[in-house]
């Protein structure tokens, strides 16, 4: 169980390096930056879409009958959640900083493994890219005369042109599939090698560094406990901030329910 927890932590903390290895794009973000960005986007989308849904509900026949005034309280609710996010920000940042610090050595070893495998597979990736560009250029050269023929020909030649293009498209698809299969075959041993290296690292850590692994687990547990304790005041503020909103909702709902019951009794 400890090994599984540590594996997840290491893979998450080295995830940006792995992504950078395969995609070769912009420099990786820190784990906390990725979590923070994801949470911000999620909360913003939830806030915007939630407001739209509430607005649509209040505009419906049922919403008008209930008259719950949910939209009036929406800004208060979103403000409360934004405040909670701001309060938990430094606490969560501290947690990730501590976790990164404790696993720095193991992450460096994993990064070294990734770089070594990257150096081995890079020629295959470059070769695949080169062949793909050559195939696209070959396809363009074959299609170009047909495009000119279409521009110069009449409408009745369109079907004939489509028949000529069909085998070219199938040929292109088959050749591309062959290159992809070849690349997959070349990369398979290195993927296995990387997986075996990770397993070996963790096995060695478990066998020769049991105390170190237990220390990782103990420190992670300690950091989580600290995070929980520091989050309690912010969560209590959230509860206190939501109480008036929930009370207002309850009063509005009961009032609407009572009015609806009276209407049923008078019918």
From Swiss-Prot:
Segments of this protein annotated with the region 10 X approximate tandem repeats: 68-267
InterPro entries: ApoA_E, Apolipoprotein_A1/A4/E
UniProt-annotated location(s): Secreted
Methionine sulfoxide: residues carrying this PTM: 110, 136
Signal peptide: 1-18
Mapped Sequence repeat ranges: 68-89, 90-111, 112-122, 123-144, 145-166, 167-188, 189-210, 211-232, 233-243, 244-267
Alphabetized UniProt keyword annotations: Cholesterol metabolism, Glycoprotein, HDL, Lipid metabolism, Lipid transport, Lipoprotein, Oxidation, Palmitate, Phosphoprotein, Repeat, Secreted, Signal, Steroid metabolism, Sterol metabolism, Transport
One annotated Gene Ontology cellular component of this protein: extracellular vesicle
Molecular function GO labels: amyloid-beta binding; apolipoprotein A-I receptor binding; chemorepellent activity; cholesterol binding; cholesterol transfer activity; enzyme binding; heat shock protein binding; high-density lipoprotein particle binding
Primary location: secreted
GO biological process: adrenal gland development; amyloid-beta formation; blood vessel endothelial cell migration; cellular response to lipoprotein particle stimulus; cholesterol biosynthetic process; cholesterol efflux; cholesterol homeostasis; cholesterol import
Tissues where the protein occurs: Major protein of plasma HDL, also found in chylomicrons.
Coiled-coil zones: none
PTM (free text): Glycosylated.
Oligomeric and partner information: Homodimer. Interacts with APOA1BP and CLU. Component of a sperm activating protein complex (SPAP), consisting of APOA1, an immunoglobulin heavy chain, an immunoglobulin light chain and albumin. Interacts with NDRG1. Interacts with SCGB3A2. Interacts with NAXE and YJEFN3.
Function per UniProt: Participates in the reverse transport of cholesterol from tissues to the liver for excretion by promoting cholesterol efflux from tissues and by acting as a cofactor for the lecithin cholesterol acyltransferase (LCAT). As part of the SPAP complex, activates spermatozoa motility.
PANTHER family assigned: APOLIPOPROTEIN, APOLIPOPROTEIN A-I
Similarity section: Belongs to the apolipoprotein A1/A4/E family.
UniProt name for this protein: Apolipoprotein A-I
Gene: APOA1
């Amino acid at each position: 169980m400890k090994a599984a927890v540590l594996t997840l932590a290491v893979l998450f903390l080295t995830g940006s390096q792995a992504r950078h290895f395969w995609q070769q794009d912009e420099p990786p973000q820190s784990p906390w930056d990725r979590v923070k960005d994801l949470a911000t986007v999620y909360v913003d989308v939830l806030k915007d879409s939630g407001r739209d849904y509430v607005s649509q509900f209040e505009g419906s026949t049922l919403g008008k009958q209930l008259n719950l005034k949910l939209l009036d309280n929406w800004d208060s609710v979103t403000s409360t959640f934004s405040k909670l996010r701001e309060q938990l920000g430094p606490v969560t940042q501290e947690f990730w900083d501590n976790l990164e610090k404790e696993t720095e050595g193991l992450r460096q070893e994993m990064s070294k493994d990734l770089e070594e495998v990257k150096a081995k597979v890079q020629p295959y990736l470059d070769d695949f890219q080169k062949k793909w560009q050559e195939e696209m250029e070959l396809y363009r050269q074959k299609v170009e005369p047909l495009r000119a023929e279409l521009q110069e020909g009449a409408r009745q030649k369109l079907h004939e042109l489509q028949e000529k293009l069909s085998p070219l498209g199938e040929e292109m698809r088959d050749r591309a599939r062959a290159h992809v299969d070849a690349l997959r075959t070349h990369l398979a041993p290195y993927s296995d090698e990387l997986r075996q290296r990770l397993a070996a690292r963790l096995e060695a850590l478990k066998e020769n560094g049991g105390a170190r692994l237990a220390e990782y687990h103990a420190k992670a547990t300690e950091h989580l406990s600290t995070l929980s304790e520091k989050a309690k005041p912010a969560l209590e503020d959230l509860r206190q901030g939501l109480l008036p909103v929930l009370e207002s909702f309850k009063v509005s709902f009961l009032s609407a329910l009572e009015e609806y019951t009276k209407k049923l009794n008078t019918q």
